[in-house]
Amino acid sequence: MQKRRDDMQFQMNTGSDIHGDRHLVDDAEKIVTAALGHLAHRLSRLEVHLADVNGAKGGADDIRCTIEARPEGMKPLAVTHSDANAKAAMHGAAKKLRTLLDSEFGKLARR
């Protein structure tokens, strides 16, 4: 499912074992934009991928969230975080991506 937020596109993809309903998409957008909102003007697209790596078998930390950001004028950057549920996985990945983007933009500013 794809949404447009100002100039930044937001896309959500789920694996076959995760039901990607409107509620999950809204949660994902809120979590990711809360973490990255201060950088939204520098991003053209965000893609969130959720997958249940163990499927029906279950298990601890088996929900994997990968978030790919496409910064304007740069190569795409991606992070992955696994956790016990979708929200926790999205929060973890969003935090990792915020740290990575802040670092990359900081490097550009120092040049």
Which ranges hold each PLM region?
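N-terminal, polar/charged subdomain of small-to-medium soluble alpha/beta proteins
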Residues: M1-R111
